[in-house]
Regions:
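Conserved NTP-binding catalytic cores of kinases and kinase-like/nucleotidyltransferase enzymes
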Residues: 1-85, 181, 196-200, 316-333
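An alpha-helical support segment within catalytic cores of ATP-dependent transferases
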Residues: 7, 13-14, 124-129, 134-135, ...
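Active-site acidic catalytic loop and adjacent metal/ATP-binding pocket
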Residues: 31-37, 46, 119, 169-216, ...
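ATP-binding pocket architecture of kinase catalytic cores
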Residues: 32-138, 142, 152, 176
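Hydrophobic packing residues in well-ordered alpha-helices of helical domains and bundles
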Residues: 59, 105-112, 136, 164, ...
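Active-site activation/catalytic loop segments of kinase-like enzymes and analogous catalytic loops
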Residues: 144-151, 212-249, 263-283, 295-302
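Histidine/acidic-rich helix-loop-helix segments that form or flank divalent-metal centers
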Residues: 250-259
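ATP/Mg2+ or Mg2+-diphosphate-binding catalytic cores
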Residues: 274-333
């Protein structure tokens, strides 16, 4: 029997749903596959998450953690953990990404900033790793390995190696000096849903204990959508006040908060650009190629605002972006 046959058998056994239809849903960047199941005029989500490829334990344990804190997540209705099959509640198909042209977009973002503050206050759980120095270094290596070395085959000069080392150390320091909170790690427009007027969170299984500004920069400097600068600045002030009111920030100036926000974003975008390349080179996923250049643009733009990171900005703008542009043109020809 194929894996799909086993999945069908699981559905028949656990839901008594021999008469059903399964429609594939565009998956995320992981090895998971999702289907919308229709049965007796009801809709459910079926997740195929092979335990040989994915550790499903955090998905299960953190679901309970966050639901107990009052967050709306997919409910796990049935599961076969040995095979990695799950039946989940259907939260609909409306993501924040589908609502970005709304006239009340700013209000959406303000509500989601407030929600992220509540998420941050979730107590630590055993499934949450510490977003420590080693963890951050591993993520930065994704950029240097998968984008710089493997995707564009760009050797680093001795001077560039020093620049990369000093820039990395600066980003690590900025992330580690922030308050440590519960971090979703992918809090962006494709992982936030609106279900019957209520905000819902998906793809929560990689939650860690890490820097306060991480989820905020994931939301406001989204790899898939760029907010106008004026709107972003206004929302950043809103977030500063919200985090202060929630006692997540204590005796922190706005300038220091913005510095944390900017440098945390640089680390996230370096990692993300590398992951987009890895998804293509290792996993054969072409759907993220279009996101590489906008993500690199964030890096060049933000790093240029800090004298100690100007070399990173120039290298990104003058070396990395042209090489990536050339490589993308070749891959698409």
């Amino acid at each position: 029997m194929t894996r799909f046959d086993n999945l069908q058998q699981f559905i028949n056994t656990h839901l008594n749903a021999k008469l059903h239809t399964l429609n594939a849903i565009t998956g995320d960047a992981s090895f998971r596959r999702y289907y919308r199941l229709s049965h007796d005029n009801k809709h459910l989500i079926v997740m195929d998450s092979d335990p040989k490829k994915v550790n499903n334990e955090p998905y299960i344990s953190l679901n309970q953690v966050f639901v107990e804190q009052g967050f709306l997540l997919p409910t796990i209705i049935a599961s076969d953990e040995k095979q990695g099959f799950f039946v989940l509640s259907d939260l609909g198909s409306t993501h924040l990404a589908d609502m970005l042209d709304d006239a009340n977009r700013t209000e959406h973002y303000q509500a989601l900033i407030s929600l992220s503050a509540q998420w941050a206050k979730t107590p630590a759980a055993s499934a949450m790793q510490a977003y420590n120095e080693d963890f951050i270094k591993v993520e930065l290596d994704i950029f240097s390995q998968w984008l710089v070395s493997d995707f564009i085959n760009e050797p680093l000069s001795a001077e560039q190696k020093i620049m990369w080392q000093t820039s990395s150390e600066l980003l690590i320091q900025a992330m580690l000096e922030q308050p440590t909170v519960t971090v979703h790690r992918d809090y962006h427009s494709r992982n936030i849903m609106n279900s019957n007027g209520q905000w819902a969170i998906i793809d929560y299984q990689d939650a860690v204990r890490g820097p306060l500004c991480y989820d905020l920069v994931s939301l406001l400097r989204d790899c898939y959508f760029k907010l106008p600068q004026e709107e972003l600045t206004s929302l950043l002030y809103f977030a500063y006040q919200e985090f202060t009111d929630q006692n997540l920030l204590v005796n922190t100036s706005f300038d220091e908060f913005k510095y944390w926000f900017d440098l945390t974003g640089l680390q996230r975008h370096l990692k993300a650009a590398g992951i987009f390349c890895r998804l293509y080179l290792r996993d054969g996923k072409t759907g993220y190629l279009d996101n590489i250049l906008p993500t690199l643009d964030y890096i060049a733009e933000v790093a240029a605002n800090y004298s100690e990171l100007k070399a990173l900005s120039e290298w990104t703008k003058n070396t990395i972006v042209p090489k990536v542009t050339e490589k993308l043109a070749k891959e698409r020809s």
